């Protein structure tokens, strides 16, 4: 349920408090409440504002594994009608005739061919999460509400809100983004580095069908991705040198569309813009630890990576699945869900996977965002090898779906 203002109780006691009501944070809260763990989610913006058409024009790639997490949290039923499936992935180098083609029919999972994932508007994902929150009496969604301080000790944590309310819990889950209060109050340090790139984003409609094919063209200034949405719509994620981004954003619309057509190769036919153009600077963020006394970090409070592999939110939803599992297991055994032993299990499970993926994505950026001859040769050899080795190709396909490593129960489709 959603509460706002100061009409609710001035002091709330719960098992877990989630700071941040974004895609990862509210998914975390829904997963816990679905499994019977009392949870409060503190969300600084109102649902009405977040669900508005102009609040967030971004889209998100939801991998197959992430769909299973959302399904286990009872959210996917609200998202599926808005989700465009990714059936094929085509990776190409602009300066080479070689390309890699991944076909979902070449891999079986759960007894049948599955999409690699789905593309959704962020606003549709938010609306689905709000709908699920209303269905869960054990989820108190405080929105709008702003956390201003966190006090922690051996027995629990206290979160104070700007309106005077207080939330007491065994565990604080920091899902409050790159400028995380939970992370900063716990004294967890960050490793960060920036790319000389920003992502230009927009949504387009086109006259020719995309047939569920996601296309990524590697260009010297950064990758250019066309991601299939519902109907004849696609999401554009265009990584470009920061010095050139303003020029492209200010182009007259017809010239900008011409640039999209040129970069995509024209296979989409006539193009029209459905949203404004926007740009986001690209950087990497890695928390040195994902846990502290009475605190666990998920999503962009813990990590942010380059969108080259489309794994940003998927990494966060793997956090959700792992942390929800360790919390639910402890709760059902009558243990303290915020104890060092419980949190250490989450840290062991998630941090290595996250650091590895961040390093892989960083390597891909440097491998593909240039046209240096020896590196170009290495790219060509790599794509040729992948095309000729079906087991290697299936390995990369499983990574795209998110079904590798030690899988939490939610990803396996097993209820918590």
Language model regions located:
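Conserved N-terminal helical subregion
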Residues: 10-13, 82-185, 193-198
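N-terminal Rossmann-like FAD-binding beta1-loop-alpha1 element of flavoenzymes
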Residues: 14-41
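Conserved Rossmann-like nucleotide-cofactor binding loop
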Residues: 24, 47, 179
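Glycine-rich FAD pyrophosphate-binding loop
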Residues: 33-55
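N-terminal FAD cofactor-binding segment of flavoenzymes
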Residues: 54-94
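Conserved FAD-binding catalytic core of PHBH/FMO-like flavoproteins
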Residues: 70, 156-160, 165-166, 171-279
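FAD/FMN-dependent oxidoreductases across multiple families
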Residues: 246-340
């Amino acid at each position: 349920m959603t509460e706002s203002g100061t009409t609710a109780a001035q002091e709330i006691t719960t098992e877990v408090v989630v700071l941040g009501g974004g895609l990862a944070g509210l998914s975390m809260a829904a997963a816990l409440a679905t499994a019977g763990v009392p949870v409060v989610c503190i969300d600084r913006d109102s649902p009405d504002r977040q669900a508005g058409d102009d609040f967030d024009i971004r889209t998100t790639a939801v991998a197959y594994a992430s769909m299973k997490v959302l399904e286990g949290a009872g959210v996917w039923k609200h998202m599926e009608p808005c989700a465009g499936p990714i059936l094929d992935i085509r990776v190409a180098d602009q300066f080479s005739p070689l390309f890699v083609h991944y076909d979902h029919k070449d891999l079986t999972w759960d007894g049948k061919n599955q999409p690699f994932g789905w593309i959704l508007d962020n606003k549709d994902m938010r609306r689905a999460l709000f709908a699920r929150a209303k269905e869960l009496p054990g989820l108190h969604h405080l929105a709008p509400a702003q956390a201003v301080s966190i006090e922690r000790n051996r027995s629990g944590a206290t979160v104070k809100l700007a309106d005077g309310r207080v939330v007491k819990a065994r565990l604080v889950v920091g899902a409050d983004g790159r400028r995380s209060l939970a992370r900063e109050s716990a004294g967890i340090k960050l490793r960060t580095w920036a790319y000389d790139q920003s992502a230009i984003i927009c949504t387009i409609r086109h006259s020719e069908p995309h047939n569920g094919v996601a296309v990524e063209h590697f260009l010297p200034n950064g990758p250019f991705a066309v991601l299939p949405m519902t109907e004849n719509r696609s999401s554009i994620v265009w990584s470009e040198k920061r010095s050139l981004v303003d020029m492209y954003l200010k182009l007259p619309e017809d010239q900008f569309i011409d640039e999209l057509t040129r970069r995509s190769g024209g296979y989409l036919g006539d193009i029209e813009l459905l949203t404004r153009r926007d740009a986001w600077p690209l950087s990497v963020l890695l928390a040195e630890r994902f846990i502290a006394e009475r605190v666990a970090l998920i999503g962009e409070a813990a990590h942010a990576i380059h969108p080259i592999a489309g794994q940003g939110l998927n990494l966060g939803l793997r956090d959700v699945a792992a942390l929800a599992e360790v919390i639910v297991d402890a709760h059902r055994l009558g243990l303290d869900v915020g104890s060092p032993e419980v949190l250490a299990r989450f840290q062991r499970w998630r941090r290595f996977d996250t650091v590895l993926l961040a390093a892989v994505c960083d390597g891909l950026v440097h491998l593909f965002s240039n046209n240096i001859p020896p590196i170009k040769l290495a790219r060509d050899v790599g794509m040729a090898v992948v095309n000729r080795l079906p087991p290697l190709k299936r390995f990369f396909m499983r990574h795209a779906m998110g079904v590798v490593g030690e899988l939490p129960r939610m990803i396996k489709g097993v209820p918590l």
